[in-house]
Amino acid sequence: MLTYLTAGESHGPQGTAIIEGIPAGLAIDVDQINADLASRQGGYGRGSRQQIEHDQVEILGGVRHGLTLGSPITLVVKNRDHAHWSSIMHPTSPATAENTLRKVERPRPGHADLVGGMKYRHRDLRNVLERSSARETAIRVAVGNVCKQLLAALGVTLVGYVQAIGPVDTDLTKPQTVSEIKDAITQNNLRILAQDRVAELHDLIDQTRRAGDTLGGWIRVVVNGMPAGIGSYVSWDTKLDGQLAAAVMGVNAMKGVSIGDGFEISRHPGSQGMDEISHDADGYHRLSNHLGGLEGGMTNGMPLIINAAMKPIPTLYKALKTVNVVTKEVEKASVERSDTTAIVPASIVIENVVAIELAKALTNSFNADNLARLQEQLAAYREELRGY
């Protein structure tokens, strides 16, 4: 079973991940991981921290001479900014007046600060925000890219892109293939399909930054190449759409997830929302894809369409009212270094967490000790589906 765990704080020395369940014999391209890490740091509307960090992955275990061993894989992404926080974030030295200078007592509305402090009895809310920070998604992207490389070896490709920023819809075209989407979104720094809206959105982001405010948006992930029948209908926790939804909602700032036409499908009669079935020499197909490639908790062979709604970043330079957890006085919330919008990097993160769930689903469906064996079994299964 494919599992992973991450550890580390935003201004600690590094983010660390251990992945278990990647088959032996998978060629790992470190450059691909680093390319995704760089993409996560990019995009219009990012804050100043991205000028400090230059994320690169280090592989400390589970890979030898470029090939996975089948044993747990350890990944590390260093935090360069830790050099400025080493005493404040020191794991063993006692707290002093000097290293408590960045103590946080004024929780930010919309963040984990207050409720996390209440739950774990922290009076210095930095103990909460350091882990709840989206900085954790850097190491999660590294995990996801390993899974994307596994998926590619199994004939599965995917891409995440930005559908909307604030009130502006940027997805004005019909669904496209993964390769077509990639070609389009790499032509701008917003990962959007509508090239004619780039300048408008730059202006919107600039105006929002000057106002001390932030923006959210919508993200879409498209997946090509998943065979039918991955996932299950027999138990609630084996439904692939439920697993994908949980993974998406586990990403910082996500407040909604849908599959295919999603919430919009509820507005239409069933005759306009289902995907009619056809058959040819290659097997069964759907004449449309309103359901986003998932029926009954299982893939149906059509492209997967996963949508995610991201709230505006709650760290505001135009700080909102809050209550000091020590004095109980009404004050302005703490202000941490932040972005105006993180919708672009979030699309990379969502792409990668979807990849993790799909890799889990495929390795759970077949013998995944060795890549070649997994490929043989998947090829035989695809052939079986064609003959059904």
Swiss-Prot record:
Q: What general EC class does the enzyme of this chain belong to?
A: lyase
Does the UniProt entry include the keyword NADP? yes
Q: Give the EC number(s) listed in the UniProt record.
A: 4.2.3.5
Q: Which residues of the sequence carry a binding annotation for NADP(+)?
A: R40, R46
What are the alphabetically sorted keywords of the record?
Answer: Amino-acid biosynthesis, Aromatic amino acid biosynthesis, FAD, Flavoprotein, FMN, Lyase, NADP
User: Under the GO molecular function aspect, what terms does this record hold?
Assistant: chorismate synthase activity; FMN binding
Catalysed conversion reaction: 5-O-(1-carboxyvinyl)-3-phosphoshikimate = chorismate + phosphate
Q: Which cofactor does it need?
A: FMNH2
Any note on cofactor binding?
Reduced FMN (FMNH(2)).
Task: Give residues annotated as binding FMN.
Answer: R131, S132, S133, N252, A253, G296, K311, P312, I313, P314, T315, R337
Which Pfam families does this chain map to? Chorismate_synt (PF01264)
How does it associate, per the subunit comment? Homotetramer.
Function summary: This reaction introduces a second double bond into the aromatic ring system.
Protein name as catalogued: Chorismate synthase
Q: Which organism was this protein described from? A: Limosilactobacillus fermentum (strain NBRC 3956 / LMG 18251) (Lactobacillus fermentum)
